[in-house]
Amino acid sequence: ILNVSPKLGPDYTLAAGQKFKSFSVYEMPFDSDDRERKGLFKRRLHYTVAPWATENPIFMHLTSSDPDVIRTAIDQCATVGYEMVIISFGSGLNAEDISEENIAKYKSLVDYARNKGVELGCYSLLSSRWISDEVDVINPKTGKRGGMRFGSAPCLCSDWGYEYFHHIRTFFEHTGMRCFEHDGSYPGDVCASTHHTYHKGLEDSQWNQFHKITDLYRWMCENGIYINVPDFYFLNG
């Protein structure tokens, strides 16, 4: 008998009138022990249940947020047939800044790129960053932050976490960017805090954080935004 369940949680409190969405499991029987044939089976499974896994745009990473440099890169990509420019790590772009000035700056660049047949995207760092004792995930072994997958990381179900996702979505809605490169995407860190607004404690922390980040990825997929994230999110686009 196959038993599939989370190692922790969900420990979800379902209020009257609410709906609970559980996890999905895909089973695929093989008709052969041949390694190559099994590989083809796995490929067909991913193409069927996650067709976005076939997306493979030709893109350029750009480490500058200077509008003149970005336009030059767009022109170069249009000339050689590249499909996308990602304003990447070290560029200075801040997708968490949803001020009118920042939105206007990047929307004008998105419009310029689209007129050239090129899409524009951006980078954002999430997990491997230290915010504060009140925001970061709490290690259940120590009762303090630190010692997690990337050292320390913000809890996605803190007020800071929800604000982060609101800012990212707002930035994409208003600029029209079509690629999101997420660095240090949620790696499964648990959080023992009992003071974060959107989870109760350790038992529901992983479940709620995972669903928070996949909600963003699903929204992006629904709106034609290419997501450059680790493979283990392929089935949650």
Would you name each region that the model predicts?
Residues 104-105, 137, 143-237:
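Active-site neighborhood of glycoside hydrolase catalytic domains
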Residues 1-136, 162:
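Conserved structural scaffold segments of CAZyme catalytic domains across common CAZy folds
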